[in-house]
Each structure stands twice: as structure tokens, then as C-alpha cells.
Amino acid sequence: MEPSFWHEKWQLQQIGFHQNQVNPFLVKYWSHIGLNENTEVFVPLCGKSLDMFYLAEQRHTVLGCELNTLAVEQFFTDNGLTYQVNHTDEHVVFSTDQVTLYQGDIFTLPKSATASISGFYDRAALIAWPEEMRQQYVKALAALIPANVSGLLITLDYLQETLKGPPFAVSPRWVESYLTPYFDVELLECVDVLADNPRFMNKHVPWLNEAVYKLTRKS
């Protein structure tokens, strides 16, 4: 999957993956991570997610990484936030006092950028990748998360042959196979959300399971 795919989606505003409300699992389970106020939370492939605004409202500082410039700019403008822009070798850095978004490739994000995080949140990153790239992403994510840091992972699972991703189906077995080498994994909840997703219903997808996991980076 080439970067041009995502750039085109944002340019055409074909962003069905963007949710117009905070994810219910985030609201329900974020307290399970047990972070204090004023701690930093990493959000990979963040888009312009309202979930970041929610995390900021919980008095965390938010560190995101997003490939597309328009997505980053829209996050700040949609929320009425004035930002500053700086540059690193590989990324353009948009920041306010509480939110810093690295615009660029997550695979070139340096470990130093996430060295001080205390938590992380992945709702739309893991499920954005087809199989081979998803495995590469897991390795990249694990490299960016310091030891013993916990976060939430939200996945979708369905019969992949019934719908062309993204989002791509990620099963509990896949999570078990590919994340447990790097993370302790705890399934918190899994529910069928097909009735809330017309796109999947219109394609006659028989079921759509949304799951939330607590991940803790192994030492």
C-alpha cells in the first residue's frame, strides 16, 4: 500500500475511517491504563481523530504521527487550535502546548520522539495495513514503545473476503501470534458492531467484531 493511496483519500475527503465522535471503547477503558495527568500519550497514524482531543481533555499531552499534511492541519483547524510548525530531517512537526503531531512516515520516526511517553493508543493504525505491512508496523510500533508502557489497541475483525480493506480484518488469533512477542496482551471486550456500520451491512458482511485490548510493552 503506497503513501499515495492515503494522500488521495484525504485530498478527496474519502475518509470513512474518520469517526465523528470519540470512540466508546476509549472512553470506557482508558482508565485501565492508569496514567497520571500531564503524562504523554502516543497516537500512531492519528489522522485528525477526535480521540486525541479527548486524551488532551484528560490532561495528557498528545504525541501523534500522521502521513498526510491535510489531516494534521484539519485536526488543529477543526478544533480551533493555533499551532507552530518546525522541521526535522524526516518530519514536519505541528505543535501546540498540549498536542504535537509529526507529519511524515511512521517508519522513519526516531525512537527519541517517543522516549518520554507513558501510554499509547491505536484505534486506526494496525487495521489500516494489509497483512505483510501490518507485521512491519508491529515491529516499528514495538521499537517506539518503551519497556513497561501500556496502551489500548482497538481492532476490527470480519470475513476479509466479503470486503476490500482498509480497514483490514485483524483477528484475536492474529493479535496473539504477532503482538505477544513484544507485548503482554489482555482482551478487555469484544462486541459485534455490524448494526452501527452501514458500509459493512451494505456489502453483506455477516458480522463485524470490534475488540479492545490492553497492551503492555515487554521489557
From Swiss-Prot:
GO terms for biological process: methylation; response to metal ion. It holds the Pfam family TPMT. GO terms for molecular function: thiopurine S-methyltransferase activity. It comes from the Bacteria. It is an enzyme of class 2 (transferase). One of its GO terms (cellular component) is cytoplasm. Gene3D superfamilies: Vaccinia Virus protein VP39. It is found in: Cytoplasm. NCBIfam families: PRK13255.1, TMPT_Se_Te. Belongs to the class I-like SAM-binding methyltransferase superfamily. TPMT family. This is Thiopurine S-methyltransferase.
